[in-house]
């Protein structure tokens, strides 16, 4: 090392290795002049500048431009000259550094994105740049596409949404929507005037429906659950435009109603594709929708207004079902044409008059919404009294091929058997099991449901409310899979119910039975009480004696009693153990049992 005259060591800066190996780009005068010409012609269109320079890549041109622009700006500041006047160059303005709405901008398609360019200051023509496809320019493209997409967000917003929507909807039906213009997305968003008119129609239908339910004498009170779920319906289509416009105004859409019915599956599919739960509800409700919605006067079955009204009513039915019963399970549409439609005079006296007036699409759809709404409300009100209403049902409902309603529950017959088991008391005769079921339901719902008695007085309920109760019972049973009982469990329950007291019912259980039963009913209103003592009819008494005779072969009576009354006690509560220890200390006869706590004790001895 060389030393200074002052004796200090000279600090020699060693170059870093990567700067030694890297060769700096050399720009000749010709290339620089061509670069400046291209700047004047094309601005920041780097691909066109690359074609004009012809010896450098776009990445190299951009880095050179950055250095060149900063150099020009420094010179202009130093000399006090306006930027660009010295070299007669209009430096393109930098990109606006806005924070994007979404931090990672998504590309709308796999094709090349046409980038738009901010114009040159001196008013020369601005040409759109294209995406660079060279592999060595990946870094430049990544830097370039981010600010380009930031500036394009406002312009191409509708294009992006249209493209994304079409890519989703084209899997259902590719011919349903035209992809040529970007204004199709606006048809799927309701304007404020149309939304207010739609809400007006819905409010009128709701008020009419409340008036009709009061006239009808159903002691249900006002409906508290929401009738209408907001559904994304294509408002550009004339199905909903005729709903939102009053019938006196001419329809703004040029299509006819017959054409609308033909395009109905496309609209419904594109609408229900957004929400899969609503799609499930719509398919379930449309499988039970009557094919001919003629009320009082006979209307020809193929007339387009009724068919279009049925189309709009399917969405109304789905939303009403969704609001009333929650999410529905997947059910296949019924092959048999069952579930005969009920006459609309059941729900209100003025329904027939309105059905005869249903010449336009608006009246038909409003009426169908009222009909489905009242049907869903009856399903809700009859849900509590479903077991009590079973007394007034004909016996033919138990046979699977007797009525169309039993076809409707045929696919889920096992679920219906799980809920109310006819053979739970050891007997299959309908008279005894009906009595046991009625007694059980009355005793179970005695303390909590005061409204059951009011509904029990009205035994002349229509067929539809009972079928709705059955359907809602089946659907709620399927949605709770832990309530399902297997066949082996059902056989075990039959054996347990044939005795008076279950093995698990301790004395502590009998003391606090009412409190726990109320808690259980509040928690799970549809659950089956397993610690429930069934009353034995004479037929069941004979059955139990016969079973006892079969079991008693080869056993003495004490063994039989000990086997019948003793069961597996999985865990004992602390209060139970305290009671047992007190009983054992007071009773010297059973004092030996303290040595072996795992031995089984008779319930009769423990209670003395």
From Swiss-Prot:
Listed name of the protein: Protein CCA1
Keyword terms: Biological rhythms, DNA-binding, Nucleus, Phosphoprotein, Transcription, Transcription regulation
Domain comment as written in the entry: The N-terminal part (11-82) is essential for DNA binding, an internal domain (136-316) is important for homodimerization and for interaction with LHY and the C-terminal part (317-608) is necessary for interaction with CKB3.
Effect in UniProt of substituting residue 433 to A: No effect on CKB3 binding, but loss of DNA binding
Phenotype seen when the gene is deleted: Altered phytochrome regulation and shorter circadian oscillations. Abnormal pace and rhythmicity of the circadian clock. The double mutant cca1 lhy accumulates higher levels of JMJ14 but lower levels of ATXR3/SDG2, and exhibits damped H3K4me3 levels near the transcription start sites of genic regions.
Residue stretches in coiled coil: none
Reported effect, residue 6 to A: No effect on CKB3 binding, but loss of DNA binding
Stated induction or repression of this protein's expression: Circadian-regulation with peak levels occurring around 1 hour after dawn. Up-regulated by APRR1/TOC1 and transiently by light treatment. Down-regulated by APRR5, APRR7 and APRR9. The CCA1 mRNA is relatively stable in the dark and in far-red light but has a short half-life in red and blue light. Modulated by BHLH80/FBH1 via direct negative promoter regulation in response to warm temperature (at 28 degrees Celsius).
Gene coding for it: CCA1
Modification(s) after translation: Phosphorylated at Ser-5, Ser-6, and at least at one of the position Ser-431, Ser-432, Ser-433 or Ser-484. Phosphorylation is involved in dimerization and is necessary for binding to promoters and regulation of the circadian clock.
Composition skew (Polar residues), residue ranges: 109-119, 207-223
Effect of substituting residue 431 to A: No effect on CKB3 binding; but loss of DNA binding
Basic and acidic residues bias locations: 122-152, 189-206, 369-396, 406-421, 440-460
GO biological process: circadian rhythm; long-day photoperiodism, flowering; negative regulation of circadian rhythm; negative regulation of DNA-templated transcription; positive regulation of DNA-templated transcription; regulation of gene expression; regulation of protein-containing complex assembly; response to cold
SMART domains the UniProt entry points to: SANT
Lineage: Eukaryota, Viridiplantae, Streptophyta, Embryophyta, Tracheophyta
Cellular component GO terms held in the UniProt record: nucleus
UniProt source species: Arabidopsis thaliana (Mouse-ear cress)
Annotated effect of mutating residue 5 to A: No effect on CKB3 binding, but loss of DNA binding
């Amino acid at each position: 090392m060389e030393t200074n005259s002052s004796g200090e060591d000279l600090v020699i800066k060693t170059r870093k290795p990567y700067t030694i190996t890297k060769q700096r780009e050399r720009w000749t005068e010709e290339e620089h002049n061509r670069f400046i010409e291209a700047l004047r012609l094309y601005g920041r269109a780097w691909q066109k500048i690359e074609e004009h320079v012809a010896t450098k890549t776009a990445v190299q041109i951009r880095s050179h431009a950055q250095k060149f622009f900063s150099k020009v700006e420094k010179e202009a500041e130093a000399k006090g000259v306006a930027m660009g006047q010295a070299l007669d160059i209009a430096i393109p303005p930098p990109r606006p550094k806005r924070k994007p709405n979404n931090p990672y901008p998504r590309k709308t398609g796999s094709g090349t994105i046409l980038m738009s360019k901010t114009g040159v200051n001196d008013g020369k023509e601005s040409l759109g740049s294209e995406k660079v496809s060279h592999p060595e320019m990946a870094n430049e493209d990544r830097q370039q596409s981010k600010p380009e997409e930031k500036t394009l967000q406002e312009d191409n917003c509708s294009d992006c949404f249209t493209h994304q929507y079409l890519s989703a909807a084209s899997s259902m039906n590719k011919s349903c929507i035209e992809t040529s213009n970007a204004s199709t997305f606006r048809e799927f968003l309701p304007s404020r005037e149309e939304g207010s008119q739609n809400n007006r129609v819905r409010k009128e239908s709701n008020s009419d429906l409340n008036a009709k339910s009061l006239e009808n004498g159903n002691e249900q009170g006002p409906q508290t659950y929401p009738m209408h779920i907001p559904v994304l319906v294509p408002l550009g289509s004339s199905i909903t435009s005729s709903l939102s416009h009053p019938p006196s105004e001419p329809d703004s859409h040029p299509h006819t109603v017959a054409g609308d019915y033909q395009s109905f599956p496309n609209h419904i599919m594109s609408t229900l594709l957004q929400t899969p739960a609503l799609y499930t509800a719509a398919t379930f409700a449309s499988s039970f929708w009557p094919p001919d919605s003629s009320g009082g006067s006979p209307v020809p079955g193929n007339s387009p207004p009724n068919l279009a009204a049925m189309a709009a009513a399917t969405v109304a039915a789905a939303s009403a079902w969704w609001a009333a019963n929650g999410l529905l399970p997947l059910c296949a549409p019924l092959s048999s044409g069952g579930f005969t439609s009920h006459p609309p005079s059941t729900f209100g006296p003025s329904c027939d008059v309105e059905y005869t007036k249903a010449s336009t699409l608006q009246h038909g759809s409003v009426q169908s919404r009222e009909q489905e709404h009242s049907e869903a409300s009856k399903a809700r009100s009859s849900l509590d009294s479903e077991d009590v209403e079973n007394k007034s049902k004909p016996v033919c409902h138990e046979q699977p091929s007797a009525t169309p309603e039993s076809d409707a529950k045929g696919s889920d017959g096992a679920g219906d058997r799980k809920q109310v088991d006819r053979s739970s008391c050891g007997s299959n005769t309908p008279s005894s099991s009906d009595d046991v079921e009625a007694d059980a339901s009355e005793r179970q719902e005695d303390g909590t449901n005061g409204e059951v008695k009011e509904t029990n007085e009205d035994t002349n309920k229509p067929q539809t409310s009972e079928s709705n109760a059955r359907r809602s019972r089946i659907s709620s049973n399927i949605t709770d899979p832990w309530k399902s009982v297997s066949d082996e469990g059902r056989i075990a329950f039959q054996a347990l119910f044939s005795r008076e007291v279950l093995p698990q019912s301790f004395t502590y259980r009998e003391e606090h039975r009412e409190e726990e039963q109320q808690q259980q009913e509040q928690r799970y209103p549809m659950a089956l009480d397993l610690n429930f003592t069934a009353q034995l009819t004479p037929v069941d008494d004979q059955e139990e004696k016969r079973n006892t005779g079969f079991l008693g072969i080869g056993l003495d009576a004490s063994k039989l009693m000990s086997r019948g009354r003793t069961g597996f006690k999985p865990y004992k509560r602390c209060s139970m153990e305290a009671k047992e220890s007190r009983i054992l200390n007071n009773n010297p006869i059973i004092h030996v049992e303290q040595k072996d706590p795992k031995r089984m004790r008779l319930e009769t001895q423990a209670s003395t």
